[in-house]
Amino acid sequence: MIKSEADLSDVIVIRDVWAYNLESEFDLIRGIVEDYPFISMDTEFPGVIYKADLDVLRRGNPNYLYNLLKSNVDALSLIQVGLTLSDADGNLPDLGGQKNRRYIWEFNFRDFDVERDPHAPDSIELLRRHGIDFERNRREGVESERFAELMMSSGLICNESVSWVTFHSAYDFGYLVKILTRRQLPVALREFLGLLRAFFGDRVYDVKHIMRFCEQRLYGGLDRVARSLEVNRAVGKCHQAGSDSLLTWQAFQRMRDLYFVEDGAEKHAGVLYGLEVF
């Protein structure tokens, strides 16, 4: 299924990826990543089943937060990955087709079984309300092992030419590292950050971290930050990984153009919100 919605003169199309079209969609991505080296990413997963101690959370403790992340990611499974590829000017790929149609991707995974696997019920209900069909994912979704194999050869990772743009992405990267390594996350935060750099490079931008350094006071989740920056959602719904990956990219673009024209955002790269180790 392909969903689209007009954004000014362009129509943004979300390419839904299932098991049957996984390889052909990665073929498309492999062919364009050199020209569209900015990759914005979002994931959907079944919430968290291990909760943070609020007092520790307020004080900020990267090692504690990583241990909590590891406990949740090790126990849970990925539901969706959204990818938006762009060039430095913000142009999305047209894939050689109609010039007013631009494309982003949403990968649907089969790993999570809502009837069997641990999850946070309120998170599952939220995702259902926003259109995720867990039964279809189980029937037709992508196997994470095959996704990882194709990602390794896609040019998206282990590639010094690409930049990754995310929002509050420690969990997002946690799930990707888990499926890429096919094992539980490492015990030590520094080892996890080493794997993050090995796979995704040094140019990883977490908008939730970077917005601390903007002149305008920005706070809250992705939708609130986007509204503060006067960025509108171009396609899809919140809590859908493809749509959120595009909104993340557009918020980053606006933030970069407003606050980091002279003093670039590069010096804030490589740090994930909540896991700040300097």
Curated annotation (Swiss-Prot):
It comes from Arabidopsis thaliana (Mouse-ear cress). The gene is CAF1-11. Its main location: nucleus. It holds the Pfam family CAF1. Its cofactor is a divalent metal cation. Component of the CCR4-NOT complex, at least composed of CRR4 and CAF1 proteins. One of its GO terms (molecular function) is metal ion binding. One of its GO terms (biological process) is defense response to bacterium. This is Probable CCR4-associated factor 1 homolog 11. It catalyses: Exonucleolytic cleavage of poly(A) to 5'-AMP. Its EC number is 3.1.13.4.
